[in-house]
């Protein structure tokens, strides 16, 4: 398709009879930042390794710029990979690590010097050219790995959980750096991550995977606000799942005997084969009788930026709620939400 730099078509993979990928279909546009997100064992790293050329699929096609990628050897693919371990050379300094690929291609000395220094500036390592790799921090090593990959001018940069080894604050900073670099350079990034916040904060689109299948592809906003199935709703963030609600008609649902307005349509009439999702941060705590349901605070947990409450309402339903207000166990409250807080999806077929 037009502008697709990379296309995976019904890609499958198994190891000794154990199916790892169950027919992956994915189109990636030139210049996109795509993240494969999922729990351990979901197939995201295998997908990346197949694209990189480290693994062969059992079946399916991978097209790069409209041509079959699979017969092309790793060193001929216009990709570079950044690993979680960085894979830097400990006996080389920063400059020589970054220059390694250009030297193997016998790049002219003046061009090599110019390109390496350009990347050193790009990743903010000016003054570190002669520094020994073992004397660098984790974040600095990550910058060297990025510069070493980008100096080869790949058309696609593959990133295998590149920030996983960093501490929390440094990881957050490097997320911003990765996104900045990707925007400035304009090449396609394909990253693997198990970190939801990481994927949602820096990706143009997120590919949510589980048990070898793609569960949903969409923008971070779509993935979070419009999960396509129960698994995605539970995996991405936190959710209140109403499994016994009724879709009365377009823009109307029923929860515990009360009718609520929603934005959803095309689920039929009086349909029970649906789940209703309401995020904890979308529920407001009100005084008794001021909301939709009265309830009692059963549990409170301070999370730093907010309190997490468990409130029991009608029919013993327990609601998880995030609020900046402090409450005590046994406080009497009521709960309320806006129409757009309700999201309806079909129940998963067993």
Curated annotation (Swiss-Prot):
Limits of the ABC transporter domain: 6-236
Supply the enzyme class, top level. translocase
Q: Indicate whether Cell membrane appears among the record's keywords.
A: yes
Q: What is its EC number?
A: 7.6.2.11
What InterPro entries does the record point to? AAA+_ATPase, ABC_SmlMolc_Importer, ABC_transporter-like_ATP-bd, ABC_transporter-like_CS, Mo/tungstate-bd_C_term_dom, P-loop_NTPase, PotA_ATP-bd, Transp-assoc_OB_typ2
Q: Name one Pfam family in it.
A: ABC_tran
Matching entries from PROSITE patterns are given as: ABC_TRANSPORTER_1 (PS00211), ABC_TRANSPORTER_2 (PS50893), POTA (PS51305)
Positions with a binding annotation for ATP: 38-45
- Which molecular function term from Gene Ontology is one that the record holds? ATP hydrolysis activity
Per the record, the major location class is: membrane
Any idea where this protein resides? Cell membrane
Which keywords, in A-to-Z order, does the entry hold? ATP-binding, Cell membrane, Membrane, Nucleotide-binding, Translocase, Transport
Which reaction(s) does the protein catalyse, per the Swiss-Prot or TrEMBL entry? ATP + H2O + polyamine-[polyamine-binding protein]Side 1 = ADP + phosphate + polyamineSide 2 + [polyamine-binding protein]Side 1
Any one Gene Ontology cellular component term annotated for this protein: ATP-binding cassette (ABC) transporter complex
- The protein's superkingdom reads Bacteria
Lipid bilayer topology: Peripheral membrane protein
Role this protein plays: Part of the ABC transporter complex PotABCD involved in spermidine/putrescine import. Responsible for energy coupling to the transport system.
Q: Which family does this protein fall into?
A: Belongs to the ABC transporter superfamily. Spermidine/putrescine importer (TC 3.A.1.11.1) family.
Fetch the NCBIfam families from UniProt.
Answer: MMSYN1_0197
Quaternary structure, from the entry: The complex is composed of two ATP-binding proteins (PotA), two transmembrane proteins (PotB and PotC) and a solute-binding protein (PotD).
- Its recorded name reads Spermidine/putrescine import ATP-binding protein PotA
Gene that this polypeptide is encoded by: potA
């Amino acid at each position: 398709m037009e502008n697709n730099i990379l296309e995976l078509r019904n890609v499958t993979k198994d190891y000794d009879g154990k199916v790892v990928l169950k027919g992956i279909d994915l189109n990636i546009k030139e210049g996109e930042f795509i993240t494969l997100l999922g729990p351990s064992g979901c197939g995201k790293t295998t997908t990346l390794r197949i694209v990189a050329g480290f693994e062969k699929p059992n079946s399916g096609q991978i097209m790069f710029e409209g041509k079959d990628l699979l017969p092309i050897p790793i060193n001929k693919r216009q990709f570079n990979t950044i690993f979680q371990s960085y894979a830097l050379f400990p006996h080389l300094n920063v400059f020589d690590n970054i220059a390694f690929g250009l030297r193997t291609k016998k790049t002219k000395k003046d061009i090599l010097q110019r390109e390496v220094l350009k990347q050193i500036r790009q990743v903010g390592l000016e003054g570190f050219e002669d520094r020994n790799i073992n004397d660098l921090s984790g974040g600095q090593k990550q910058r060297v790995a990025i510069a070493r990959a980008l100096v080869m001018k790949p058309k696609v940069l593959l990133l295998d959980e590149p920030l996983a080894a960093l501490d929390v604050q440094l990881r957050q900073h490097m997320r911003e750096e990765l996104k900045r670099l990707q925007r400035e350079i304009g090449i396609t990034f394909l990253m693997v991550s198990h970190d939801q916040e990481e994927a949602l904060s820096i990706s143009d689109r997120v590919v949510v995977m589980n048990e070898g299948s793609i569960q949903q592809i969409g923008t971070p906003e779509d993935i979070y606000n419009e999960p396509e199935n129960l698994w995605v709703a539970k995996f991405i963030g936190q959710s209140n799942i109403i499994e016994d609600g009724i879709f009365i008609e377009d823009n109307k649902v029923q929860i515990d005997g009360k009718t609520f307005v929603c934005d959803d349509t095309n689920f039929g009439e009086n349909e029970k084969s649906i789940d209703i999702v309401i995020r904890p941060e979308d529920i407001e705590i009100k005084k008794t009788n001021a909301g939709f349901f009265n309830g009692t605070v059963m549990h409170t947990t301070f999370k730093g930026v907010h309190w997490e409450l468990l409130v029991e309402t009608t029919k013993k339903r327990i609601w998880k709620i995030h609020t900046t207000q402090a409450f005590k166990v046994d406080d009497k409250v009521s709960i309320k939400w806006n129409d757009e807080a309700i999201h309806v999806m079909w129940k998963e077929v067993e």
